[in-house]
C-alpha cells in the first residue's frame, strides 16, 4: 500500500479563524492517490472549540461546482492544539478536503496555500453545488493521511478462460 496525503501537511496554530455556518473546501494539496483516508487532523483556534464537526472528501464537477464523495461526523474539536481523528473516507486522486461545524473557528493562514472555497450554510453531503471564493491563497489547519487499497487475488472475481 502507498501513502496518501491530502490537505494541509503542517497542521499548526494560525493567526486567523474561519467561522462556523459555512461548508469550507480546502484546495491546498489535493489527494495524491486513490484509496482511504484513515486519519484527519484539525486545529481549532485557541478559545474557539469547534462543535458538530463533519469532515469529508469532495471533487470538482466543473468550474466552481463541487460534489462530496464521502464524509464522517467527528464531533467536537477542542481548541488550542492539533487534534487527530480516525476516519474511513473514500478518496480519489485529485479530491480535496471539506468540513462543516456549527460553532467555533478553524485556524487558517493567508497567504500560504492554494485557496479556500465555501458554500454559505452548506452541509455535507452535497451534489454539484456552486461554491464561492473565500481566498485564492489561504490554507486551513486541516489535513489527512491514508493509504491505497490493494485487491488480493484471494477475494477477487475473475472472468475469462485463462487462469
Say what each PLM segment does.
Residues 81-89:
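Exposed aromatic-hydrophobic patches
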Residues 1-68, 88-93, 100-160:
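Beta-sheet-rich sandwich/jelly-roll-like modules and their strand-loop junctions
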Residues 74-81:
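Short proline/glycine- and polar residue-rich coil/turn motifs
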Amino acid at each position: 500500500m502507498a501513502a496518501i496525503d491530502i490537505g494541509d501537511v503542517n497542521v499548526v496554530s494560525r493567526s486567523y479563524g474561519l467561522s462556523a455556518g459555512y461548508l469550507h473546501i480546502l484546495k491546498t494539496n489535493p489527494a495524491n492517490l486513490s484509496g482511504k483516508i484513515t486519519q484527519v487532523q484539525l486545529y481549532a483556534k485557541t478559545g474557539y472549540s469547534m462543535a458538530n464537526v463533519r469532515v469529508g472528501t469532495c471533487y470538482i464537477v466543473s468550474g466552481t461546482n463541487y460534489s462530496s464523495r464521502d464524509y464522517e461526523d467527528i464531533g467536537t474539536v477542542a481548541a488550542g492544539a492539533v487534534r487527530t481523528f480516525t476516519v474511513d473516507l473514500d478518496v480519489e486522486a485529485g479530491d480535496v478536503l471539506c468540513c462543516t461545524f456549527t460553532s467555533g473557528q478553524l485556524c487558517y493562514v493567508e497567504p500560504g496555500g492554494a485557496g479556500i472555497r465555501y458554500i454559505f450554510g452548506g452541509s455535507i453531503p452535497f451534489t454539484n453545488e456552486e461554491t464561492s471564493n473565500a481566498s485564492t491563497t489561504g490554507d486551513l489547519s486541516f489535513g489527512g493521511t491514508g493509504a491505497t487499497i490493494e485487491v488480493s487475488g484471494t477475494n477477487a472475481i475473475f472472468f475469462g478462460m485463462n487462469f
